[in-house]
Every structure is written in C-alpha cells, then in structure tokens.
Amino acid sequence: MNSRSLIRLLSMALALGALSGCASLSKSECLNANWEDIGVRDGANGQPEEYLIQHSTACAKVNVAPDRGAWLHGRDKGLERYCLPHRMYNIGEYGGAFDAGICRNFDQERLVDAYEKGRDVNRRANTLSEIDAELRDIRTKLENKELEKKERERLAYRLGQLEYERIDAERSLEHARRRARDL
C-alpha cells in the first residue's frame, strides 16, 4: 500500500471512528492481532469491507496497521458462514436489514428469497402481536364497572372481531413459517 492510499485510508478511518464512538478492537486485540482470524469473525458477522476502517482507527491508537490482505482473505472465509439462506431468513425474521452487496459472490436469488420469507414471518408475527395488544387493552377496559352501556357494547363487538382476526393472523403466520421450511 503506498503512502497516499494509507493516508486516505487513515483519514477515512478517523472520520468514521469519530462518528462511530466506540472501538471495534481493544488495544490488546490490536497488538496481538491475527488479521485473518479477525476477518473470519467479521465476515461471519456480515461486516462490509469498509469495516476494516474501524479496525484501522482503533489500532492507530497503538500504532498498528491492519493487514488488509489477510483480513480480506479471512473475511471471505467468514462470509461463507454468513451468506447462507438460513442466516438470511433469520435476519429477515428478526427484522434486520439485508445488504445484498455483502453477499455479492453468492447465490443472490436464494439469499433474497430466504430473507423475504423471514421478513414475511416477521410482518405476520408483528400483526399477531398488535392484535394481542389490542385484545388485552379491550379486556382491561371491559373490566371497568363504570363503563357506559354503548361503549361496553362497542368494545364487546370489537373484541369479537379481533378474536376472528387473531385466528386468521395465527393461520397466516403458520402458513408463512411452513413456506420457509424448505430453505
């Protein structure tokens, strides 16, 4: 790496470090770094190539520069563990974001399909949770002995509607989970 590239990399690292607020590696990790192993870990966690800038910032404090080649080699190995359909499904199911660029050397169609199935499960589970919250709220209101008759009737009617909606939402969620089993 020439000095101009190193200066540019360090400048970006300092800017990113100032924004990020916390070090990606400790002083000890920098001083004893096996950059390939760190790359494997980062790849397995789906970190983008730009993440190396954070390591550069953290390690600059102890005058250590990352071995970019070793880190990239390790990251590629780690991505083999990250860029899998079941991982993308889990990211989608738990509401995470999918960055297709990170897994650009893998089967994008399968990964996006898995992610979308996970997102579908996430959306349906959220719908079910919202219905459950509204059901609890209505049941709590119906416990009020001073509730006016018209309001009690309105709430009781809505409670019945929600119970049917909940059955549909449960079926919908189970259907989405069954669709995802073939990953």
Explain the meaning of each model-derived region:
Residues 22-183:
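Intrinsic-disorder/low-complexity detector
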